[in-house]
């Protein structure tokens, strides 16, 4: 179980050759401007190279999968895109969905301090396709559809260059844009604005894949959805939602699931009223509220300073999500597909605290600070106020110095927001009969030395550059480009691309040329992903037991004591 599994360079070369199933050189004709016919019209893309191989990739950017959600269609479910005449240029990056670019800019600290900022527009429901150049139409390569993260308020499809993953993994990669923030997730809780429109954008993109991916060389019967952070929340939501039935066949989440606190809400009306009041709209009538917000300029909705730190969650609406995710998981009416999911070993170390403005507070963290910051999330988890200090003290232990308190705070927040929800979700899937493969990514990218303190390990999002082949991307301005990667990191990226794409191809990340990856069964084995990977068992066992057994038991005992006390008082 604890046996180290070493991966030598020669094996990695074999991994790549095995996955490509063809010579490293491009076997098809080199076409500088490839063209493909879709059901809506013809598109013209461009070809790009990838470092380390002569294989070329056809890239098509900004293909519409839905009509622009403007005017009366703002806050509505997406409508199918309209056909076009002639050949549509798909060679340049499309605008991002409307968002606060300043917030988007902070995500450059995921890897190396770089971040491409594209123009923004409400007319943004497009996707990008990356396909190996020599793959003929109808050849049936696995399809991997990526949903970006960004707390459901920022992000762009083009920030994730799929060319290296397509070339080395011999897959067709699709990256999707969806409406964000108030435009993507505003809900009145009724028919006037049911909510989840950003989620439904992703569903519409998956329908486009079913209807159009074959001419790009993809297999519509072998579609893997994958996403990171909030994108992972959407992916896990697709597994639970009846509206996504039959649109995908495997799923991957990276540091995010829909049971993360705050990501979905059953009572959207109070937030709708807050938004309306802030923007000088009626806060009593849903119909008047929606009509007023539809008439506002998009920038006014997105850039309002009073709404700057507002989170816009998914909504339990009775249709897209018939019940809460936890209820759906318990009742098991969801799509049973192979699932690969995992976390990083330092999720709440630097990137998320920086985005939340907590870095300075963390340096001089006190018990009172920790309790104050954690109160909202503990409240959402139904922890009684009287018991919150008990939870905090469980993490603090006897530590008194600021550094130890900071570390305890990071562990607590990482567990609450990512680790515990991911493990819990894994267990539900496993118990339903779905094959599950769990990982913990543990490698600190060498590029962190430029932008993050030495104590930061595998921060939130650190795995992305390895999954997308960052060391091999030609465009070094790309968010995930990693030209300074060490040889060890290049090999790690090759391995992870091989594992992710083999899972997309077969539903299992294991092959003879790859490190053994145990299935997450009752023994709860998982893979510790490092340059020298090894199998682990019972991820953070003591803390998972605390949250799944010890704390619920203590809360139940507390409620019983309160009930008994009230009964005594009533005598």
From Swiss-Prot:
Keywords from the UniProt entry: Disulfide bond, Endoplasmic reticulum, Glycoprotein, Hydrolase, Serine esterase, Signal
Active-site residues, Swiss-Prot/TrEMBL: 229 (acyl-ester intermediate), 347 (charge relay system), 460 (charge relay system)
BP GO annotations: low-density lipoprotein particle clearance; xenobiotic metabolic process
Annotated InterPro entries: AB_hydrolase_fold, CarbesteraseB, Carboxylesterase_B_AS, Type-B_Carboxylest/Lipase
GO cellular component: cytosol; endoplasmic reticulum lumen; extracellular exosome
Reaction(s) catalysed by this chain's protein: a carboxylic ester + H2O = an alcohol + a carboxylate + H(+)
Disulfide-bond pairs as recorded: 97-124, 281-292
Tissues where this protein is expressed: Expressed in liver, colon and small intestine.
Mod. after translation: N-glycosylated.
Subcellular location: Endoplasmic reticulum lumen
Positions glycosylated per UniProt: 105
Major location category of this protein: endoplasmic reticulum
MF-aspect GO terms: carboxylesterase activity; carboxylic ester hydrolase activity
Domain of life, per lineage: Eukaryota
Leader peptide range in chain numbering: 1-26
Motif (Prevents secretion from ER): 568-571
Its job: Involved in the detoxification of xenobiotics and in the activation of ester and amide prodrugs. Shows low catalytic efficiency for hydrolysis of CPT-11 (7-ethyl-10-[4-(1-piperidino)-1-piperidino]-carbonyloxycamptothecin), a prodrug for camptothecin used in cancer therapeutics.
Membership in a protein family: Belongs to the type-B carboxylesterase/lipase family.
Protein name: Carboxylesterase 3
UniProt source species: Homo sapiens (Human)
């Amino acid at each position: 179980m604890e046996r180290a599994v070493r991966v030598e360079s020669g094996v990695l070369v074999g991994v790549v050759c095995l996955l490509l199933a063809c010579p490293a050189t491009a076997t098809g004709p080199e076409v500088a401007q490839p063209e493909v016919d879709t059901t809506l019209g013809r598109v013209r893309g461009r070809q790009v190279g990838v470092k380390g191989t002569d294989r070329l990739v056809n890239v098509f950017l900004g293909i519409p999968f839905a009509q622009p959600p403007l005017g009366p269609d703002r806050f509505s479910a997406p409508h199918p895109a309209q056909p076009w005449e002639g050949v549509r240029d798909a060679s340049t990056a499309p605008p991002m969905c409307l968002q606060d670019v300043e917030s988007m800019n902070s995500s450059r600290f995921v890897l190396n301090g770089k971040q491409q900022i594209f123009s923004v527009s409400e007319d943004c429901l497009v996707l990008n396709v990356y396909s190996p150049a020599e793959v003929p139409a109808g050849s049936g390569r696995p399809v991997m559809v990526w949903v970006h993260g960004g707390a459901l308020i920022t992000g762009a499809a083009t920030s994730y260059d799929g060319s290296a993953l397509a070339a080395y993994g011999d897959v067709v990669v699709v990256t999707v844009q969806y409406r964000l923030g108030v435009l993507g997730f505003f809900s009145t809780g009724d028919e006037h604005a049911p909510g989840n429109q950003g989620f439904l954008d992703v569903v519409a993109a998956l329908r486009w894949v079913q209807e159009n991916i074959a001419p790009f060389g993809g297999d519509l019967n072998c579609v893997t959805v994958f996403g990171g952070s909030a994108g992972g929340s959407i992916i896990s939501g697709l597994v639970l939602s009846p509206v996504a039935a039959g649109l995908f066949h495997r799923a991957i989440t990276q540091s995010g699931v829909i049971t993360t606190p705050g990501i979905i809400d059953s009572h959207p009306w109070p937030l709708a009223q807050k938004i309306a009041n802030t923007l000088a709209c009626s806060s009593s009538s849903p119909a008047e509220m929606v009509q007023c917000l539809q008439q506002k300029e998009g920038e006014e909705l997105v850039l309002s300073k009073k709404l700057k730190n507002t989170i816009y969650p998914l909504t339990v609406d009775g249709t897209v999500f018939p019940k809460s995710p936890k209820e759906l998981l318990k009742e098991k009416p969801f799509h049973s597909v192979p699932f690969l999911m995992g976390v990083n070993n330092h999720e709440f170390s630097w990137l998320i605290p920086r985005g939340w403005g907590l870095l300075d507070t963390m340096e001089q963290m006190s018990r009172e600070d920790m309790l104050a910051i954690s109160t909202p999330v503990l409240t959402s988890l139904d922890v009684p106020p009287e018991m919150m200090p008990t939870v905090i003290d469980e993490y603090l232990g006897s530590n008194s110095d600021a550094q130890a308190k900071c570390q305890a705070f990071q562990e607590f927040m990482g567990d609450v927001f990512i680790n515990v929800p991911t493990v819990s979700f894994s267990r539900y899937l496993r118990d339903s009969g779905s094959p599950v493969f769990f990982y913990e990514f543990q490698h600190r990218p060498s590029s962190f030395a430029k932008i993050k303190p030495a104590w930061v390990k595998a921060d939130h999002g650190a795995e992305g550059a390895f999954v997308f082949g960052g060391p091999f991307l030609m465009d070094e301005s790309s968010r995930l480009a990693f030209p300074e990667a060490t040889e060890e990191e290049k090999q790690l990226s090759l391995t992870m691309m091989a594992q992710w794409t083999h899972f997309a191809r077969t539903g299992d990340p294991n092959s003879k040329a790859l490190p053994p990856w145990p299935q997450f069964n009752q023994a709860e084995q998982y893979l510790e992903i490092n340059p020298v990977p090894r199998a682990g068992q019972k991820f953070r066992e003591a803390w998972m037991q605390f949250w799944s057994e010890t704390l619920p038991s203590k809360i139940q005992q507390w409620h019983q004591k309160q009930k008994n006390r009230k009964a005594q008082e009533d005598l």
